[in-house]
Amino acid sequence: MEALRNVFDFSDFPRIDLVVVGMVALFLVVFPLLPHSSFAMATMIQFLMFSLYGMGWNTIGGYGGQVDLGKAQYLGIGAFTTAVMLIRWDVPFWVSMPIGVALAVTWSFIIGYPLFRLTGHYFAIATIATSLVLKDIFEVWDFVGAARGLEISPIKYSPPDFLRLIFKEDIYYYYIILGFFFLGILYVNWFRKSRLGFQLRSIKDNEDVAQSLGINVHWAKIKTYAIATAFVSLVGSFHACYIKNIEPEDTMSLDLSILIALMAMLGGAGSLWGPIIGAGVLIPLKSYLKEWLGAKAGLVGIDLIIYAVIIMLISAVEPRGIWGIIEKIRRRKRA
């Protein structure tokens, strides 16, 4: 019962925060009913997806202080599991998605055990290495389409197909990912108040002290890493049905892993709202830059340069990101 109360308990936030959150939530619910372009709808779906990626990264990277730069490998496992099972055996999304999550979590336990013997930059580099190795394996593995990837053909089905997540109108995809988005917020709100959440924050503050208090540091990290993996893999499965054309080069790229981490850091790692704020800033910017400065102006990669500049500027002002700046302004007003 206490765990259930923690899910819906936002009392540690100021009332003004909850008012703003309520207004944003209302806007997200009614957005498809307002006049909008297909570009705006696609951007909003990307925002919700990357918010969830960021929430997952934030559990291990924000609350645990472990900089993971290999999250795209789990996105790929979820995406390719769903695509392979749908194309080869006509398995519905609601069956293939949990299987993809289970496979991704299993892989996270396999590599997490040795990875979390490493610390600091060594851990970050190791996560990059494991992700790139898995991407290379997928690029030569014919069963998952190798480098050419896989394509889910909507022609085979009669949309709207809620079992396989095949739709002609993006509004269906929007409300499904919005549901996952709200559930993700509730889960992270529970996690940060859970025993594991407190253990992670203790480990982040001082690993030796946490160990002296009886916390199994290694196991706490591995469990949290699995939770972060489940978030990313779940959205990866959705990604396969939404995009319909997936390739290892795009789905499991290092750029994608870095972007996921940057969003949480920009918004405020270790805070509930940080990944959402980060996605709210970077995803519209990403969509605009790729549409107008990338493809049309021929400035390939300009988006990554601008992300780096933004992160450096924010970090120079407040290392805890945009949420840290908001809290700093509040403290000054109280003083």
PLM features: residue spans?
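Transmembrane alpha-helices and adjacent helix-loop boundaries
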Residues: M1-A335
